[in-house]
Amino acid sequence: MLFLGSHVAMKKPHNFQGAIQTAISYGANALMVYSGAPQNTIRTKTEELKIKQALEIVQNNNLSLNNLVGHAPYIINLANPDETKRAFAIDFLSQELERFAAMKINKMVLHPGNYLKTNPQEGISLIAQSLDLIFEKTKHLKTQVALETMAGKGTEIGKNLEELQQIRTQVKNNTRVSFCLDTCHLFDAGYDLKENLEEIIQKIDSILGFQNISVIHINDSKNECNSHKDRHENIGFGKIGFETLLKIIYHRAFACIPKILETPYINDKAPYKREIEMIKAKAFNPELKKLF
């Protein structure tokens, strides 16, 4: 069965309840939310998120809790060599895991971090140490942190599969570490999904393990392979292309994994309902952007 959805915003006053209703209106059976704005750490109180109402809708629509995904804000950096800033990040992400657990979301996607003025290996060590502290603070939870593949902009860690696996290997309680594949990021980092898809999928298994992949972000790319740009494009309108993305979405190795669209809005309107329809029909609509 295909588990497909998109990022949906949690907006006041309906918050989580509204996000679930929006996802269902798109024809989705999976979704991803931030527990607040991705660009800051301001958060609405958990008791105001309308969690009970949201979970009733989930149950009434036969949605699986395993297909609900959380995402940490972009601005958190566990690789920051500044101890004060890193301590804040550790405390904040511990609170985020508590919030997602209250929402019955069992995985939180995280951009691993930026090593800034140090080096990749030091950054990897700091991320692993930080995750150890986070998992100790939240040892009563089972919520996973899904480390995301990155495009390799600047000093990003996670630009290759090996860096992500190194983090997981160094974490003591690594049963709570999984991975999120992002198609745009992989392509922009130099993994040519268009030309070498099966080879890359086998590499994902040998380095990360299929059993450790918990989320896949489905995005086309505005830029060429190995560009290190990280600019998402609508499905089929970028350099990866519809057919390649379809092969990934329907690949047997990823059958049970929720796929989440993070494609750009078109004229300030969410394209997800139309993109989900295209994917389910397995037919690209070159006129899609004209519909908005």
UniProtKB/Swiss-Prot annotation:
InterPro entries: AP_endonuc_2, AP_endonuc_F2_Zn_BS, Xyl_isomerase-like_sf, Xyl_isomerase-like_TIM-brl. Its cofactor is Zn(2+). Zn(2+) 3 binds at residues 185, 230, 232. It catalyses: Endonucleolytic cleavage to 5'-phosphooligonucleotide end-products. CDD domains: AP2Ec. It comes from the Bacteria. Binds 3 Zn(2+) ions. Coiled coil: none annotated. The keyword Lyase does not apply. Endonuclease IV plays a role in DNA repair. It cleaves phosphodiester bonds at apurinic or apyrimidinic (AP) sites, generating a 3'-hydroxyl group and a 5'-terminal sugar phosphate. Belongs to the AP endonuclease 2 family. This is Probable endonuclease 4. It comes from Onion yellows phytoplasma (strain OY-M).
